[in-house]
Amino acid sequence: MLNGKILFSLFISSIILLSTASYANSSEVSKTINDQNMKNTEEIPIKFNRIIITGNCPFGVIMANDLAYKHVVGVGPWAFLHSNMKLLKDMKPDIDRITTDFINKDYVVNMESLLNLQPDIIYYYGKSQNDNLERAGIPTINLDAGGDTKFEPVVTQTYWENEFNQTLGLPHSHKFSDAWKRSLNEAKPYAEKIKSQHIRALYLEQSDGKELKVSGPKTYGDTYLKMAGMENVASDLVVKGDAGRYINVSMEQIIQWDPDVVFVVFGSAKDILNNKNPGQDWHNIKAFKDGKIFSTPVGLHNWGGLSAETALLPLFMINKFNPDYITDAELKVATRLHYKKVFDYEIPDALLTDELRQR
């Protein structure tokens, strides 16, 4: 029987192979435009001049392609709601031109407002974001790759990058596949060490003082923990549908799990460590006693979702669990490199420090 290390190596290898296969099969554009001859990309005409994206996660991918980004006129409000706007405006000084007003406060598309934007193409993610968009009478593209991609971030982001390039008539690129390869290769030896220690982690999607929602099995959160070599304490929970990936649990359930480390996505690790959330008492949980409760960083979006920076999340998790494995300085170097390679952006020291601080 294969031992744990071999199984983990196969897990990482399969992720990298899947991402490579995903973009290798999408070479229609690259047949006519050589990736290595990109000096005159500004002259390449785009098929659609006014782009709308209803979801927040794919927006981070299109931001990495200036040829496409400059044509985005509307995006879902979550794209900015959970962003570090200081960083976003530093990278994209024109970001204020992009509106979110075509989506109402109840997250339903306002068709009149949408049509006023005169879009040429609309991208959405999954049935829950469709909202009868065909009423607009223009091309609509579903960015849901289907199947198990709901918990495969590498394949999903690679698919989005390919889909944007193909539908907009842009050159083939593989920035996000490459980013995941860099991160997973750097994380691998340390993730294997952590795996041998059987570290039990909780991926706390939401902790707002009212609800506690966690990532169960076959979710992005579950995958991120595995990438860092950790075991998901909520792996036995039942996941149902898109919304089912966020599972409500009680404080008593978390006490019973007694995780070694907790990663907080939408919420504040500081509030938990200071016991500021009403109805929650974390005192007897190992992660609390050891001070191992951390907020996922917020950059262009929250790293803990599926953002433009999520490829860095396994490195962040390893760094927080044991800074002797990946130091704070090494995490900063990796983050700088990511922004440079994916966005051609030099992040200022102050913004990088702010992004990685505990919330």
Regions found by a protein language model. Give the residues of each.
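Bacterial N-terminal signal peptides that target proteins for export
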Residues: 1-10
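Alpha-helical, coiled-coil/dimerization segments enriched in small aliphatic residues
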Residues: 216-244
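Sec-dependent signal peptide cleavage junction
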Residues: 20-27
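Short helix-initiation/N-cap motifs at beta->coil->alpha
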Residues: 37-38, 96-111, 238-251
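A short, structured surface patch at a secondary-structure boundary
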Residues: 53-116, 121, 126, 230-233
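Structural recognition of the beta-strand scaffold that forms the well-ordered cores
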Residues: 52-54, 73-76, 121-125, 140-144, ...
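Extracytoplasmic substrate-binding proteins
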Residues: 25, 41, 129-213, 295-358
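Bacterial N-terminal signal peptides
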Residues: 9-19
